[in-house]
Amino acid sequence: MKDNESIRSPGIATGLVTDIGTGNLSRRAFLARLAILAGGSAVVMACGTQATAIAPSRTSASTAKPRPAATTEAAASEEAMIESGPVEFEADGRTLLGYLSRPVLPGPHPGVLLVHENRGLLPHFLDVTRRLAREGYVTLAVDMLSRKGGTDSFADTGAMLSALRGIPTDQIVEDGNAGVRYLQDQPYVDRSRVGAMGFCFGGGIVWRMAVGNPELRAAVPFYGSAPTLEDVSNLQVPVLGIYAGADARINAGVPGLESALKAEGKIFRFVSYPGANHAFFNDTGSRYHPQAAGEAWLETLEWFEDHLMDS
């Protein structure tokens, strides 16, 4: 699949065979994606590949279930590869809160700014920062409720949603950009290789950061509302847009956005997962879709590898 095209993911297993057969998917990406499929014998038979010869090369997207006892030692070793914890930094005279995960190796490493959903910086997003750190990225999740006391100051998610609605979008975008600058200032981050990803509300924020912050090197908005189309001409960031096939509200804005991106010759790729709904990546929510989440995670890692890790 070339950049500046959009695709619908067809049942995932069938799509993998089609993509590798037509040269749209590298063998490395094919093997990594095949490793997450359960019951993928049809793919193995079609490609003449032995399933036992395939080992997952990337972190699984699902952490909803506890690890089996047999993997406890491996999990401990994996966690020893990263350091994680809360951070604070200044922006416009205010203290912003966040959670940062990074590889223990000295680096410098590429960085990723993560923007949470519209319910605050909940544990799921802390986990995503750790997953990315295990892949080699210094990852900062900014608490976009910092100006209201922080996520931990709210008793329930309804109050978090209400508080976020009370913060101007431009302010939230600027707080995201402040997080990018904080990452760039860290000695273990390569300031020239910083990207952003976000989910739901955070996906929309990442789109707005992408059209306004030329220092970003890659962006991955998950089911985020489209930016103002007039701003698309300002985009200097390669964007991977992840969408859910059953997400009618967000998908209504995709055709116009896609047309604007193509007209401006921008680097982008859109992937949609039929049968998945808005927020399908969140493994703590009722709409979690394990297969779509796993595939979207590998798409994300491939995008960041191409535009952050290998650049």
What positions do the PLM features span?
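N-terminal cap/lid segment of alpha/beta-hydrolase-fold proteins
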Residues: 66-104
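Short amphipathic alpha-helix adjacent to the substrate-entry channel of hydrolases
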Residues: 123-147
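Short beta-strand/loop motif that positions the catalytic acidic residue
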Residues: 241-243
